[in-house]
Regions:
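NAD(P)-binding Rossmann-fold cofactor-contacting core
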Residues: 161-189, 193
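Phosphate/diphosphate ligand-binding glycine-rich loop within oxidoreductases
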Residues: 2-131, 250
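Rossmann-fold NAD(P)-binding glycine/threonine-rich loop
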Residues: 103-106, 223-299
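Short, conserved loop/helix-junction motifs that constitute active-site signature segments
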Residues: 4-8, 134-136, 159-161, 209-211, ...
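Redox-cofactor binding/interface segments in oxidoreductases and associated redox assembly factors
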Residues: 73, 218-222, 245
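A short, charged, Gly/Pro-tolerant segment at domain boundaries
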Residues: 294-312
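Glycine-rich adenosine-cofactor-binding loop
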Residues: 15-18, 112-118, 132-158, 170-175
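Rossmann-like NAD(P)-binding element
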Residues: 63, 172-175, 200-231
């Protein structure tokens, strides 16, 4: 890992794995004009599950460099909190509860960490999921048990209307056990099920157990920083379901698997674009201590779609 040089302009960082491939590097200057902020963005790339000392070095750099104002963290949200949480002067309740952080900022000389994903995943989900969706009798299936899975699962479990079951699968046991304990505290009476599924075919079988009108979410990171899908190409999505690919870039294999079945099985397929926009604007608001109103967000969404050639 190579740390950035000392900032000479107000700087926000993006801590990820392949930050140079993110649309934010192109979009940030346009957003800065809309928001009236004079700042630049730089990426800090770390391997998945990096050395704890590398996480501490990144946090120490931001903490002690005057013009380094903060950062958005992706992929490393749990690991950076576990490795460097003690270096923060303040962690918000979500960061403490979920042992993860997606936002690093400074206020009055204090280094602050926030877990914004429970908010941003909820905003993104509300943008496309019908309000009466859980009246249709479906389940929710979250594939993955990392920070994004924790966030969207906690949001779903915090709503008055809920799925028949919340099902979580993961390829490794440690994080699956951790998310089970966490959700047990958040919603002890909710109907939840947890499955160790190291192979795609095992996730396929879980998928086939879901009733029609379910919500299926890829929260694994596969299809973005790493190619592939948590499902095999033989998977069958339940009819009338909503399929959410958290990623908006990469090979997006999971999303394409759903799109191939969309017409025949009446699927609604979403990528992670709106999640990306909400995720970044929430953290930018924290780093620069500004308010991003719905009107400003709408302007950012419109301009970003134009720049990236996306249909609105």
């Amino acid at each position: 890992m190579i740390l950035p040089e000392k900032a000479t302009l107000p700087t926000m960082y993006f801590i990820g794995v392949t930050t140079g491939k993110s649309s934010i590097m192109t979009l940030f200057p346009y957003w800065a004009k809309i928001l009236g902020i004079n700042a630049v963005i730089k990426g800090i790339d770390l391997p998945i599950h990096a050395d704890p000392e590398d996480y501490r070095a990144v946090v120490d750099f931001i903490k002690n460099d005057p013009l380094s104002l903060g950062a958005l963290v992706t992929t490393h949200k749990i690991d950076i909190c576990n490795a460097a949480g003690d270096m923060f002067d303040y962690l918000d309740p979500y960061a403490v509860m979920f042992s993860e952080l997606s936002s690093i900022s400074k206020r009055d000389g204090r280094l602050e960490g926030y877990a914004k994903d429970p908010i941003t995943s909820g905003l993104a989900l509300e943008a496309f999921l019908p309000r009466d969706f859980w009246d249709r009798g479906g389940d929710a299936y979250i594939i993955g048990a990392g920070g994004s899975a924790i966030s969207v699962g906690s949001y779903i479990l915090g709503q008055k209307k809920q799925p028949g079951r919340l099902v979580v699968s993961n390829r490794s046991a440690g994080r699956l056990e951790a998310i089970e304990k966490m959700f047990g505290k958040i919603a002890p009476d909710a109907k939840t099920e947890y499955y160790l599924a190291p192979e795609a075919e095992q996730a396929d079988r879980i998928l086939e157990s879901l009733p029609p009108n379910s919500l299926i979410i890829n929260a694994t990171g596969l299809g973005k920083d790493r190619p592939g899908s948590p499902l095999s190409d033989a998977c069958i999505f339940p009819e009338g379901s909503y399929v959410w690919e958290f990623n908006y870039r990469g090979d997006l294999r999971f999303m394409h698997q759903a799109l191939e079945q969309a017409e025949k099985r009446r699927l609604h397929v979403e990528d992670g674009w709106i999640y990306f926009l909400h995720g970044w604007t929430q953290v930018i608001a924290e780093v620069f201590h500004i308010e991003i109103t719905p009107e400003i967000f709408s302007e950012i969404e419109k301009r970003s779609a134009e720049i990236c050639g996306r249909k609105r």
